[in-house]
Structure formats: C-alpha cells, structure tokens
C-alpha cells in the first residue's frame, strides 16, 4: 500500500513586514514560484507525493492558476502557517499519510532537506519530524552574533542523545555561560 505525501506551502499576502511577500520577485522570479519549484522537484522523485499552495488571498491563487501551481483557498482566520497547512489538508479529497509544511517564504530551502524528512519518515514513521543541524563553534558564534541584530530569526532546538527534541526557542539554547571553556 502506497503512502501519500502532501507538501503544503502556506503563503500569506498580508505580511506585516513585507505585504505581498509571496509575489515579490527574487532575481525575476516570484518567491512562491521558487518555493513551489522546490516542492515540485521533490514530488518528481516521490511518486505518491503532491504539493499545494495554501492561502487566503485571491491574488496568490490567481498567480498560481496562471503559473500552473496547485493552490487552495484557506480560512482568513488561520493565525499561523501551521494552521493554514491544517486547513488546506482538511480540504483535500484524500487525506495524506505524511504532511510537510514548507513555508512559502523559504525559497532557499535545499530540496535534500525535504527529501531526508521523507526518507526518515519512511524508515521510521513518527508523528512529527523537524529538520535541524548541529552547529560547530564557528556557526554557533555566527548565530549568537546574528541574534544581536535579528533576535527572532531562526529557531534553535535542544535535543536528547537520541535526537528527540526537548525544547525549541527563538533564543539560543542551550545557554552556554562560558563558551570559551566548553570548546
């Protein structure tokens, strides 16, 4: 029995910091097109995979229709990308076995990250997967420095010895009081 995978791309036009963000062009290509291309490339390599843009704005669905990108209208009451994903999933005729939330403002997501999520799920099914990377000291230093000017960019995760998430934070966790001694 094949397992159905659905990549949902939540896209909100009414962004506070950058209204119309999904349709902003990056090097001449709309951001939502770039993210949809990532999803499409994953689906080409996974026969039971499909993708859909989830939005509450007709400007985005109109663009998607013109560009040949599958899209679904969601409720205007969704408070987050995750809620928008769930709303889109609930509107599907056939319920997927595995749902991937690929944020519509993530045009630089490497496709191998999504493929690895799929591979991990197939190898060891679980309810939730969150990709994360282990930082070396140079990367940690860069993260700490960038948090000084953009404190809410990026999420850190604390994992146990088996890789299970214990906590997520917009701050840097775990707190390392004297990193020079821990190196």
Residue ranges and their predicted role:
Residues 24-27, 73, 145:
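Alpha-helix N-cap and loop-to-helix initiation/capping positions
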Residues 58-119:
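Short phosphate-binding loop-to-helix
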Residues 3-55:
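N-terminal glycine-rich phosphate-binding loop and ensuing alpha1 helix
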Residues 1-9, 62, 70:
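Glycine/serine-rich loop-strand microenvironments at binding/catalytic pocket rims
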């Amino acid at each position: 029995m094949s397992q159905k995978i659905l990549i949902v791309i939540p896209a909100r036009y009414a962004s506070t910091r950058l209204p119309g963000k999904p349709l902003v062009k990056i090097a001449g290509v709309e951001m939502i097109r770039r993210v949809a291309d990532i999803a499409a490339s994953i689906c080409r390599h996974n026969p039971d995979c499909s993708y859909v843009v989830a939005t509450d704005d007709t400007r985005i669905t109109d663009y998607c229709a013109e560009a040949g990108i599958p899209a679904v209208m969601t409720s205007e009451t969704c408070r987050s990308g995750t809620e928008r994903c769930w709303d889109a999933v609930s509107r599907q005729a056939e319920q997927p076995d595995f749902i991937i939330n690929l944020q519509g403002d993530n045009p630089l997501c490497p496709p191998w990250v999504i493929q690895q999520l799929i591979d991990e799920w197939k190898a060891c099914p679980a309810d939730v997967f969150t990709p994360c990377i282990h930082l070396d000291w140079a990367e940690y230093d860069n993260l700490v420095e960038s948090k000084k000017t953009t404190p809410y960019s990026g999420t850190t995760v604390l994992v146990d010895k088996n890789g299970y998430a214990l906590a997520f934070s917009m701050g840097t966790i775990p707190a390392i009081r004297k990193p020079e001694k821990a190196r």
